[in-house]
């Protein structure tokens, strides 16, 4: 069942990516740690929505689709893997050489197992909540910090949830 869920999510991510190849992609990498001190390594691809809402002299609201793979180191030396997909809203501030932005999003993640480090997730499919801050740099580059929380929202017990706090870098192609 877990393998089928992970395969379904992977197929959806690949289908989405294939449907958006005409758009410029951002490839990202992140290194972080969980609240329990285990390391996380994430690689992802994102596609900007190419839309602006609520434009003002302060900035504007926009967003992107994000698909990623994360490796979660475990305290018992057997790590976990996850595939995730999320819509992410960003607010980009105007009038700066390097554009600051904040981001927030809620998506889905499929884990290879329900025990991640010392945390018991209860289910292999979980919600992925994020909040972050970043800077857009020249050459379609971004750097920033991000906090992400994964849990099943109490749908199945136990629901310890897990957080990842990371530094990220992305580059457009």
Segments from the language model and where they lie:
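Cleavable N-terminal export/targeting peptides
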Residues: 1-24
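Short loop/turn motifs that connect adjacent beta-strands in outer-membrane beta-barrel proteins
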Residues: 21-25, 50-61, 94-100, 140
């Amino acid at each position: 069942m877990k393998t089928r869920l992970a395969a379904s999510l992977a197929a959806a991510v690949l289908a989405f990516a294939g449907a958006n190849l005409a758009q410029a992609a951002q490839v990202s990498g992140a290194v972080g740690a969980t609240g329990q001190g285990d390391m996380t390594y994430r690689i992802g691809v994102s596609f900007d929505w190419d839309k602006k809402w609520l434009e003002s002299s302060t900035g504007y609201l926009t967003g992107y689709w994000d698909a990623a793979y994360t490796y979660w180191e475990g305290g018992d030396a057997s790590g976990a893997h996850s595939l995730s997909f999320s819509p992410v809203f960003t607010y980009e501030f105007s009038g700066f050489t390097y554009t600051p932005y904040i981001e927030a999003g809620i998506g889905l993640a499929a884990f290879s197992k329900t025990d991640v480090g010392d945390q018991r997730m209860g289910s292999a499919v979980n919600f992925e909540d994020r909040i972050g801050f970043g800077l857009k740099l020249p050459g379609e580059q971004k750097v920033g910090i991000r906090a992400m929380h994964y849990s099943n929202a109490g749908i199945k017990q136990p629901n310890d949830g897990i957080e990842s706090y990371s530094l990220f870098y992305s580059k457009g192609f």
